[in-house]
């Protein structure tokens, strides 16, 4: 036995000696699908900081510089780190298949790229991309129940996003994790490249500074550079937040809000609407979050933008034929539909005239549609996700209904034009499910006593819906039983949080771990739940579940079966014929 162990150790040592050092890393990564003529940064990182004479990089067997038609830049010990780097910023390639090989001594790394062309003439004049942030299947189901009603096993109507001819399952994972965040998930839609958690418009390399990582061009930048299209970005989050920022940003850190504001200014989408005004304000302005002397409110005005800070100002700008609008309606996130329409909580006392996503969508289309070259519009219902993080499903579902109403606005605009591609897709899912209904008339003193499953899951008795499809009463005796599969220590009340967004957990006495919010635990039926997340978690998390995409218009027929999230970019780019040498 000892001899066998010695032999195995000897073989293992010999194998280790024969294996190459840590492999070189090539960006873009293996299996990248790159739009012909789009701009991207080419980078190869070599471990152990070799000299340029000790490495070689080829593309299809030829020197990289020859293929790109430009010299590359080699940096030994980049940023003083223990690696060297070969760079080419702003590269582009004609359509074709490419094999990239990076050699360092006996070590070699290989990646393959597909550079795809887009056919002319362009099929779509306009593209409207709706992103329901965190909108899981249960969100759509619950929205349909609340907005349309249910009777004898059938819904009494369809959602606007359901009534679309094309559908696909979309996988959302990033390069570094099975479960994505909103940054690299939205980045996949707007660039066609995979990336890592927290990244926007970049691959995640070893660079120390967040703005120095290898960049890839966004669809908004492409539309501005290659066409005369107008571009719009609409959200009810802070405009610098991950999803809207994915249209313009290039940073390894999604929280680089001040830099992202500058990136919005550099790209200059024609219509920009959301919250997050403090990062636009000059440092000397009370409430500013900027650390420099820039006043981006003034800069946008000088660039010809009208500023709107209320719904009334937004509508007046649209009615006046404004073509460039900067709409900043809250210092933080815009309040969701549940608070705007029903509970009247959130920040309404401070910002009483905030537009919702539906109103923003209508105003944006009115301002963009006059462009003879068409428009590209991204609309996000951001708080579907934020409320699911808070385990506040009623607010999350109200914002799903709101997104659906915005989709109806777009469908009404598209009508019979046959020139507008409309896509509705989440960026990722949450682990949320409907397991039955709670009925206060069921016997028992515990929340689980009130739960009806299977034959006992009788329909809820929410109040009548208003003209927009929102129930006018939700704190009723029979309610949907909606549960989340990820949660910190918390208490489930089984009822809507009418006094403000739910706070599932708070800091414990040690200041490190989180404990259940006793405010929720004091209710008569509250069920205390031991969390299933790490102890420092204070909210729910995303899931790796596939999400449902629905679409209509020119190019939508390409959505079928299962696709990676990067495919959404490809369909939009092909519909707009954005490729070219």
Map each language-model feature to its residues:
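Extracytoplasmic mature domains of secreted/periplasmic and thylakoid-lumen proteins
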Residues: 193-263, 268-269, 276
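Solvent-exposed serine/threonine-rich low-complexity stretches and specific carbohydrate-binding patches
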Residues: 60-81
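Short, compositionally biased P/S/T/A/G/V-rich stretches that sit at domain boundaries
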Residues: 23-38
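Aromatic/hydrophobic beta-strand junction motif of beta-rich domains
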Residues: 40-49
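A post-motif C-terminal structural segment
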Residues: 42, 70-73, 85, 135-187, ...
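Gram-negative bacterial Sec-dependent N-terminal signal peptides
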Residues: 1-22
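Short, hydrophobic beta-strand segments
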Residues: 76-94, 113-117
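Short, aromatic- and glycine-rich surface loops/edge beta-strands on solvent-exposed regions
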Residues: 95-105
């Amino acid at each position: 036995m000892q001899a066998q162990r010695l032999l195995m150790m000897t073989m293992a040592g010999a194998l280790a000696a024969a294996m190459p050092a840590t492999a070189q890393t090539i960006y873009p990564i293996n299996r990248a699908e790159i739009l012909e003529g789009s701009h991207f940064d080419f980078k190869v990182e070599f471990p152990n900081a070799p000299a340029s004479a000790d490495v070689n990089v080829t593309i299809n067997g030829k020197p990289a510089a020859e293929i790109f038609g430009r010299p590359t830049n080699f940096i030994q010990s980049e940023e003083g780190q223990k690696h060297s780097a070969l760079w080419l910023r702003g590269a582009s390639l004609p359509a074709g298949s490419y094999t990239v090989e990076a050699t360092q001594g006996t070590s070699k790394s290989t990646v393959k790229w597909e550079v795809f062309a887009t056919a002319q003439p362009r099929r779509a004049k306009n593209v409207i991309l709706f992103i329901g942030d965190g909108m899981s299947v249960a969100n759509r189901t619950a929205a349909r129940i609340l907005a349309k009603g249910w009777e004898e096993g059938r819904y009494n109507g369809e959602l606007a996003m359901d009534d679309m001819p094309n559908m696909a399952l979309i996988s959302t994972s990033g390069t570094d994790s099975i479960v994505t965040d909103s940054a690299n998930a939205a980045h996949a839609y707007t660039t066609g490249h995979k990336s890592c958690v927290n990244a926007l418009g970049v691959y995640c390399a070893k660079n120390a500074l967040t703005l120095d990582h290898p960049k890839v061009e966004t669809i908004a930048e492409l539309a501005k550079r290659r066409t005369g299209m107008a571009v719009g970005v609409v959200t009810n989050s802070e405009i610098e937040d991950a999803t809207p920022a994915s249209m313009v940003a290039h940073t390894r850190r999604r929280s680089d809000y001040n830099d992202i504001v500058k990136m919005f200014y550099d790209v200059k989408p024609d219509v920009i609407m959301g919250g997050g005004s403090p990062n636009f304000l000059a440092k000397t302005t009370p409430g500013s979050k900027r650390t420099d002397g820039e006043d981006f409110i003034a800069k946008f005005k000088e660039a010809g933008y009208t500023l709107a800070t209320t719904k009334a100002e937004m509508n007046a700008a649209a009615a006046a034929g404004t073509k460039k609008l900067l709409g900043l309606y809250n210092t933080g996130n815009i309040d969701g539909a549940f608070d705007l329409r029903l509970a009247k909580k959130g920040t309404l006392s401070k910002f009483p005239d905030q537009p919702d996503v539906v109103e923003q969508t209508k105003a944006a289309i009115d301002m963009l549609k006059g462009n003879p070259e068409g428009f590209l519009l991204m609309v996000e219902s951001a708080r579907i996700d934020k409320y699911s993080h808070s385990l506040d499903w009623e607010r999350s579902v109200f914002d799903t209904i709101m997104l659906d109403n915005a989709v109806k606005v777009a469908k009404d605009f598209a009508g019979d034009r046959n020139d507008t591609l409309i896509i509705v897709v989440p960026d990722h899912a949450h682990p949320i499910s409907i397991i039955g209904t709670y009925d206060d008339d069921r016997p028992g003193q515990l929340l689980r006593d009130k739960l009806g499953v299977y034959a006992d899951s009788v329909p809820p008795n929410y109040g009548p819906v208003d003209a927009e499809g929102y129930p006018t009463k939700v704190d009723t005796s029979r309610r949907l039983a909606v549960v989340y599969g990820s949660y910190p220590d918390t208490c489930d009340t089984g009822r809507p949080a009418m006094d403000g967004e739910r706070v599932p957990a708070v800091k414990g006495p040690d200041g490190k771990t989180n404990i259940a919010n006793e405010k929720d635990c004091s209710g008569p039926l509250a069920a205390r739940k031991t969390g299933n997340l790490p102890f420092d978690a204070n909210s729910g998390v995303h899931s790796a579940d596939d999400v449902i995409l629905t679409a209509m218009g020119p190019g939508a027929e390409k959505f079928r079966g299962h696709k990676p999230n990067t495919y959404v970019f490809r369909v939009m780019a092909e519909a707009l014929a954005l490729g070219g040498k």
